[in-house]
Amino acid sequence: MAPPQRHPQRSEQVLLLTLLGTLWGAAAAQIRYSIPEELEKGSFVGNIVKDLGLEPQELAEHGVRIVSRGRMQLFSLNPRNGSLVTAGRIDREELCAQSPRCLVSFNILVEDKLNLYPVEVEIVDINDNTPRFLKEELEVKILENAAPSSRFPLMEVYDPDVGMNSLQGFKLSGNSYFSVDVQSEAHGPKYPELVLEGTLDREGEAVYRLVLTAMDGGDPVRSSIAQILVTVLDVNDNTPVFTQPVYRVSVPENLPVGTPVLAVTATDQDEGVHGEVTYSFVKITEKISQIFCLNVLTGEISTSANLDYEDSSFYELGVEARDGPGLRDRAKVLITILDVNDNVPEVVVTSGSRTIAESAPPGTVIALFQVFDRDSGLNGLVTCSIPRSLPFELEKSVGNYYRLVTNAALDREEVFLYNITVTATDKGTPPLSTETIISLNVADTNDNPPTFPHSSYSVYVLENNPRGASIFSVNALDPDVDQNAQVSYSLAEDTLQGAPLSSYVSINSDTGILYALRSFDYEQLRDLQLWVTASDSGDPPLSSNVSLSLFVLDQNDNAPEILYPALPTDGSTGVELAPRSAEPGYLVTKVVAVDRDSGQNAWLSYRLLKASEPGLFSVGLHTGEVRTARALLDRDALKQSLVVAVQDHGQPPLSATVTLTVAVADRIPDILADLGSLEPSAKPNDSDLTLYLVVAVAAVSCVFLAFVIVLLALRLQRWHKSRLLQASGGGLASMPGSHFVGVDGVRAFLQTYSHEVSLTADSRKSHLIFPQPNYADTLINQESYEKSEPLLITQDLLETKGDPRQLQQAPPNTDWRFSQAQRPGTSGSQNGDDTGTWPNNQFDTEMLQAMILASASEAADGSSTLGGGAGTMGLSARYGPQFTLQHVPDYRQNVYIPGSNATLTNAAGKRDGKAPAGGNGNKKKSGKKEKK
């Protein structure tokens, strides 16, 4: 764009235009000014303060400012003198294109009165643009037989100025064959046409070079030139002709891209190349060429971009039809864009407050806003509304402005923030609407104390908590805001167990987090009662209290304590006595333990951790009772060691163990008798005696077996036969003499017993059975380990495999179950080679009986080497009263022959007051005890 031309009379013209605009505005109740374009920034437009009847110093007092409609600010107010000045350089062509008049409308807002004054400024065009050809060179082809006065359209010339400053005429360089003529259109610019003035002769001159000059009517005149190349063609006496000179069509603005608008058609009477017609656009701007496209072969015009009624409602297109040699015809295409309601209304908040006091009276103005719609007609008419449930209403102001005012009293405690939705709806079909939210805060007063969500709190803390750990948090809510809602927390002063409460817990005054200042112990402190106070920071401050109960939860921090059996002070292990005649389930002792914890942390369970003889004893899971799991055998060791574990149910569980020593014997004299018989024989004839005894026992067993078979055959009792066959077999275990200890070792063994036991000495039976107990509360430990005991029989004797059913007289209990490890071997499964040496004649048998009687007599007359007072069997005083000589049994009653139910002497005593299960004689002891 060319710079504006300065004229001597410019200032007088501006002053005259300003004066006329002022007088016209006063008469029409609207302020109007007129200025030329391209004025410098800050150029004077008009004295707006004077036209409003104000003084310059009142501008700031009344809040006078310019309010424009969504476009850039072109004008501004001079705060010193109140004059209206330009905010920058104004280009009329950019602002209004080629409109005959260019008017800029805006409003002057008086802020304190909320009054609007419309202002209109006309931008007057100046000659600041030079006419410009779209092409600097143009080739024109003319048939040599073209008639004089034929016209040929030339390229379009563009001048954005209007009036006299726009394109006015053309001038062609001197030539006798051609002249230029100016054509103008009602809705378009002027364009030149080349006029043929005479007859052409291609043979005389085939090419003409012309210079075309375009001039406007400004002062001074602006002009531009273009080169025209005229080529004379051979005869083509028919030009393309459009079916109509002007095509008109109306399309909606929401037409999809690529949709055909219309098709132009031109015909040529020639044939061949001279009759082939192509189409092209002429006299269109670059913007139009981006919106529409033309098919060069069919003449169909379609859209290549979206149409917008608000951007342009009318398009004029030039279409040219050209045949092969270059003859052409032109037509106009007039496209009218129909408005569619495709623009939603817009809401622009001009002024307003974001905060209002809750004591504001009804009618208080909150905001001023403007609504407009870019559509036209009914599509551009807009109405506004807000929800009726709100204490606000809309009042119509100047033009399309609205005021938002209150119509009821406000209460911040009920609603502290209003999001007022302003809905603007046009009257199009279908109607479009938009929503704008105006947020309004209600100012607060301190009229609400802090409140806790609960009337009381219960806090549960695990004991042994770390000091300083956060254990709970309280939160009080204050419906007020800002300073009135800042809550601080504190604890009421109190004492607990002689110490201030503040030494136990503390509270963060800002967050309300409660901290433990001590590590709590459930066994010492189980609960605390606190009062928490919440106060706000208003003036005056308000507060409230809440009760908080703190409960200490138990942790599994105490292991079970063994109360019984108690560990003696001398470090020895207590001894319990289990008679060999004890049946399965016999109560040997009971382990008693306690746990200082509570709940499941104090639930105790007992289990057998280790035993010298696995499967012999069991421990009640919940009772701690140590019972025999099976019948005691003579091969079982005299001394049994048990390790019982007591475990609680905490997480993780804690446990304690206790070691029990169980002496397997009917009574103390039995222990002495058994140990006395362990004297190894130094005579070589002992082995022969044992062999003879084994042979005798085998013979008796065979006779007994034959008798049983005959009896079963006579009675036809198959079941009884099976039972007797199982009891008929038996293995005899040997006992090498080199593995026994002397009787003198009994004294050291008995002196290790520090736990007092109650023994009975009237049992003379060796009742051995192997049932598997089935107590619901008993755990049987199957672990086994080997331990050398000086008072136990040899390992070879323990591992002797014999059928224990040979040694029992009572029928078996079918409710018991045998584990695979406890299941005895079959009858007669033992090798004969594994049996020991037994007395082989009557003399040897009598010698064995004499040895047993001598041991008993020695104990009776106090000559035993075990020591101790008379009649006490060498025991200490704590056992003396229970074991006098009158309780010493006749050991001959326990002597029997293996495989037979008969003893050497008849036994009158009965264990536990029960009769033997079968036979008239006493129950026999195992072969191991007989060998002893």
From Swiss-Prot:
Topology relative to the lipid bilayer, per the entry, is: Single-pass type I membrane protein
Known InterPro entries for this protein?
A: Cadherin-like_dom, Cadherin-like_sf, Cadherin_C, Cadherin_CBD, Cadherin_CS, Cadherin_N, Protocadherin/Cadherin-CA
Q: Which residues lie on this side of the membrane: Cytoplasmic?
A: 714-932
**What is one GO biological process annotated to this record?**
cell adhesion
Q: Which GO terms describe its molecular function?
A: calcium ion binding
- Glycosylated residues in this chain: 81, 419, 545, 685
**Looking at the record's lineage, which domain of life comes first?**
Eukaryota
Protein's name in the database: Protocadherin gamma-A6
Lineage of the organism: Eukaryota, Metazoa, Chordata, Craniata, Vertebrata
